[in-house]
Design a protein with these regions (language model features):
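Short, compositionally biased
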Residues: 65-81
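N-terminal, Lys/Arg-enriched amphipathic/low-complexity engagement segments
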Residues: 1-46, 59
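A cytosolic small-molecule/anion-sensing beta-strand core signal
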Residues: 52, 72, 238
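Short, well-structured beta-strand-loop connectors
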Residues: 45-59, 78
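Mobile cofactor-carrier "swinging-arm" domains
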Residues: 1-12, 17-19, 77, 82-84, ...
């Protein structure tokens, strides 16, 4: 175990009680351009067009093999651009249940997949964009091989969901995802948790961190365990994305469901962790749970302002 001694746990009232329930029906989702540094999108859709879950919305002109896909089926409500036509968001009004199916593999055959087969399925499904590189925090270039991959199964942000609770019924998918990550690197797949979290590392290499924020940040883990450099690239990925990767390969379907923590001093029902689709509008998720004063707002992730 590595203990972080310098840091700060921000004292904010209304911490979640770590009870998961289904959130309200998703009506609007968005894929945000600023989430992807250096993105030069080539659009595959236009406003008003119907899309299926898993359908390509756009690709990166600098890396055409990577697809950015729809997390839900529905109709493209708007494509929003900013200065110099930089993509701000693609907004989808959710309706219907059409979906694109991807390659399916029996769990017993996952270890027989080649690096190219794993990468191709991830890139076509849109799950490749869950990876980030260190340094530079960009989506990895197709064909690149990281020196190691870090799975962040710990969260030290204030009012965050407990990864152990979120993963409680998804251990098999999580371990399958870790097996698949092992096909993408010749180095270690690090699985980072809190001490005694009870989260299985599977075929990965387990390590634990304790202490205040930033004990849960991937940059902290990489710095202490397997430092990156300009010539040595490390990837990191979130634990819920690893579950989605495991389910993609064993079911052939894109898993876009995510659990987020909803808390804070203005929440009416403190402790709810709604389950909703990736990319859903936070205001739609939070509105039934909040009792806010005029002129005030609530943030789902305080330290990021989002």
């Amino acid at each position: 175990m590595i203990r972080i001694r310098r840091g700060l746990d921000v004292p904010i009232a209304g911490a979640p009680e770590q009870l998961i329930h289904d959130g309200p029906r998703v009506r609007t989702v968005g894929v945000l351009g600023p989430d992807f540094l250096g993105l030069k999108p080539g659009m595959s859709i236009q406003a008003g067009e119907r899309v299926a879950k898993g359908q390509t919305l756009f690709t990166d002109r600098k890396a055409p093999g990577i697809c950015y896909t729809a997390p839900v089926a529905g109709r493209i409500a708007s494509i929003n651009r900013g200065e110099r036509r930089a993509l701000q968001s693609v907004v989808i009004d959710a309706e219907g249940d059409e979906e694109i199916l991807f390659d399916r593999v029996e769990p017993s055959d996952l270890d027989g997949l080649t690096r190219e087969q794993v990468a191709d399925n991830l890139q076509r499904s849109g799950l490749w964009v869950a990876f980030r590189t260190r340094p530079f925090s960009k989506v990895p270039v197709p064909g690149s091989v990281p020196a190691a991959i870090f799975v962040t199964a710990i969260d030290s942000h204030p009012l965050s969901a407990n990864p152990a609770v979120v993963l409680r019924d998804a251990h098999a998918d999580f371990e399958n995802g870790i097996r698949l990550l092992g096909r993408l690197t010749d180095g270690r797949v690090w699985v980072i948790t809190r001490p005694d979290a009870g989260i299985p590392a599977g075929t990965g290499h387990a390590a634990s961190f304790a202490g205040p924020h930033p004990a849960g940040l991937p940059g902290t883990h990489i710095h202490h365990l397997d430092p990156a450099s300009e010539t040595r690239t490390i990837w990191h990925v979130g634990y819920q994305d690893v579950v989605a990767i495991g389910r993609l390969f064993t079911t052939g379907r894109l898993h876009s469901e995510r659990v987020v923590a909803l808390g804070g001093p203005r929440t009416r029902f403190r402790g709810a962790i709604p389950r909703g689709s990736e990319g859903l509008a936070e205001a739609l998720l939070a509105r039934p749970e909040l009792a806010r004063r005029r002129g005030e707002d609530a943030a789902l992730v305080y330290l990021l302002g989002r």
